Amino acid sequence: MNRYMQEKWSWIDGSHEMRTRMLAILSDGDLAFNPGGQNMTLGALCREMGEIEYAYAQSLKTFTTEWSYRNAETGLDTSVERLKAWFESLDGGMKATAEAFSDEDLAKTIDRGGYAMPVETQLDVYVQANLIFLGKASIYLKAMDRPLPKDWQEWIG
């Protein structure tokens, strides 16, 4: 097992688990919630995070970050079960790819379009993307008057 999996993967697992717990308290109808203004629906926010995860997962395979992927599956952002299944697949694929890296592979660089960073740093930035998503989602949950799980209060605020 590589150093990242031993020392840091728990952060990714933890952020994925927080997202899973959020989806567990939502209904399909909740995904249509929009707090107003130029914001997207909660379901669209979840779909967007999945597209971001897809970009990061693919970058671990191609060593290039490509942000253009859009999941066009009809009804994805209106179905909690579809989102759960998609995230489960994305999470598993990313973990399998990361587990296959050697410690030396963690130093390989990933082109992010104008600059590059090591695989290990790319994974750290992915954790930050997850935390940003969870912060956004917490605003939606608060606007919906949903209680935040205890770990959200500790990690996100």
Predicted regions and their residues:
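Active-site rim elements
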Residues: 2-9, 79-81
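Acidic/histidine-rich alpha-helical segments that form the ligand environment
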Residues: 75-111, 117-139
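Short, contiguous alpha-helical
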Residues: 5, 9-13, 17-23, 28-71, ...
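Serine/threonine-rich low-complexity intrinsically disordered regions
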Residues: 2, 71, 77-78, 102, ...
